[in-house]
Regions:
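Short beta->alpha linker loops
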Residues: 44, 101, 128-131, 157, ...
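Class I S-adenosyl-L-methionine
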Residues: 1-16, 21-122, 206-212, 219-220, ...
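Short beta->alpha connector loops
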Residues: 13-16, 39-40, 157-159, 174-178
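Short gly/pro/ser/thr-enriched loop/turn and capping motifs at secondary-structure boundaries
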Residues: 40-42, 69, 131-134, 199-201
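A short acidic, often aromatic-flanked loop/helix-cap motif at beta-alpha or helix-coil junctions
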Residues: 66-72, 159-161, 199-202
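Class I SAM-dependent methyltransferase SAM-binding "motif I" and its flanking Rossmann-like core
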Residues: 105-166, 212
Length: 225
């Protein structure tokens, strides 16, 4: 039997209308929809896709448990188990569409599965999605970077000082706001934030003074000198 193909599909930041035509077409033709959550109904990426393609609810769902932990051993076991589950479906000749938030190549746990499946010789393809930082700048109505400015995309593992010392524009993702906001005020930098970009509960904070310290997990700061 010919092996199936794995597609890693970015659904964008939250607005189902920001899903690309290719993402919609792949999801529509796939035999199996894989999601990075052991409880599919709680998966943000799947819920976004369902708003664009309600018929996905009739497809076979493959939940992949991706634990929120910093324990490297637990993560490696989860990645191995997730890749094995995907390969089992591919061995059955199924086309698998793995849905992931934003773009699959930007801080996505999908990549750890993709690497394992591709290394095992299975056909794979990554379908890009609209990154959250591009959608956030658009929602705020501001340029992300211009006039030769450097752009730094910074995960929450960086300290505020490390991030703010970088030149140009900084995008701070999933950061520690109670620690970051005082550092921002002291630096004199300009900052804006989008919480839950593209989702129904999206909130825009165009200035540093408006940014609350208790914003949610899906918050993104754009910092300019």
């Amino acid at each position: 039997m010919e092996k199936g193909k794995l597609y890693g599909v970015g659904v964008g930041p939250g607005d189902p209308e920001l899903m690309t035509l290719k993402a919609l077409n792949i999801a529509r033709m796939a035999d199996v929809i894989a999601v990075p959550h052991k409880e599919p109904e709680k998966c943000t990426a799947l819920n976004i896709a369902l708003k664009a393609l309600p018929e996905l609810s009739r497809k076979t769902l493959l939940p992949i448990d991706m634990p929120m932990t910093k324990d490297r051993e637990k993560l490696l076991r989860a990645y191995d188990a997730g890749a094995a589950a995907l390969m089992e479906a591919l061995d059955a000749g199924k086309t698998v569409c793995f849905l992931t938030l934003g773009d699959p190549t930007v801080y996505s746990t999908y990549l750890y599965l993709h690497e394992r499946v591709a290394a095992a010789g299975y056909p794979t393809e990554i379908v890009p999605g609209v990154p959250s930082f591009c959608a956030a700048a658009a929602a705020l109505g501001i340029p992300l970077c211009e006039n030769g400015q450097q752009l730094h995309i910074i995960p929450g593992t960086y300290t505020p000082t490390q991030a703010l010392d970088l030149p140009g524009v900084k995008v701070l993702m999933k950061n520690n706001l109670p620690a970051t906001l005082p550092a921002l005020r002291q630096s004199g930098a300009q900052a804006a934030m989008v919480e839950n970009c593209g989702m129904e509960n999206q909130h825009l904070y165009p200035t540093l003074e408006q940014i609350p310290e208790d914003a949610g997990y899906f918050s993104l700061l754009i910092v300019k000198e």
